[in-house]
Amino acid sequence: MLIHVRDVLSAAELQQTRELLSDAPWADGGVTAGVQSAQVKNNQQLPQAHPVTQALQQLVMAGLNRHPTFFSAALPKKVFPPLFNRYGGTANAFGNHVDNAVRFITSGPHTGQRVRTDVSCTLFLAEPETYDGGELVIEDTYGSQRVKLAAGDLVLYPGTSVHRVEPVTRGARVGCFFWIESMVRSDEQRRLLHEMDQHLMHLRRTVGETDAGVIGLTGTYHNLLRLWADT
């Protein structure tokens, strides 16, 4: 399931993000790669414990916490602290790879916790017209999905996916990436719950909150979530 979540960050928050990134201490992105993915990773990344990273993390988490589509699609149990990367110049691509199944938090208030990477997420921080290339390419059973979104939008996709970032040939692609351990481990079950939730939201707007069918379907949604969720 690939989900486009719009307007996670407001225009004011994006401006604040750009101001913070203007003096960012970019470093070699290979430091967070596994042995295999390090062979194809060629980008830059902000150090996890740097104050700029921590300020950006607060902005991103605030955007996620208020966004109903993000919650509906991801059903987050744990969110790995957001990381920030840059593709451009000679450090401009990341070849095909699969994310590690479990990530270990090494800084911040949740240091020492492990996060199972059920859902991968990329939040775009640069407008698409400011750089060439840089598409996130996600391989799934329907073929290759190419993603290049407006600044402030994000994409959610299964952590099991083979994916890559195409070479950036002009400008710089700046983004945020992180992983989610979901209350519902199965991608198929999350997809069904998200689709049901979106249809319910439509029915609630068009039929009303007190319609018997709407109340019954709401109960079915929550009973399925109760059956499948692990909190």
Curated annotation (Swiss-Prot):
Its EC number is 1.14.11.-. Binds 1 Fe(2+) ion per subunit. GO terms for molecular function: 2-oxoglutarate-dependent dioxygenase activity; iron ion binding; L-ascorbic acid binding. The keyword rRNA-binding does not apply. This is PKHD-type hydroxylase Lcho_1570. Gene3D superfamilies: q2cbj1_9rhob like domain, Rabenosyn, Rab binding domain. PANTHER family: PKHD-TYPE HYDROXYLASE YBIX. Fe cation binds at residues 97, 99, 163. It comes from Leptothrix cholodnii (strain ATCC 51168 / LMG 8142 / SP-6) (Leptothrix discophora (strain SP-6)). InterPro entries: Oxoglu/Fe-dep_dioxygenase_dom, PKHD_C, PKHD_hydroxylase, Pro_4_hyd_alph, Pro_4_hyd_alph_FE2OG_OXY. PROSITE patterns: FE2OG_OXY. The lineage of its organism: Bacteria, Pseudomonadati, Pseudomonadota, Betaproteobacteria, Burkholderiales. It holds the Pfam family PKHD_C. Its cofactor is Fe(2+); L-ascorbate. Residues 78-182 form the Fe2OG dioxygenase domain. Keywords: Dioxygenase, Iron, Metal-binding, Oxidoreductase, Vitamin C. The keyword Metal-binding applies.
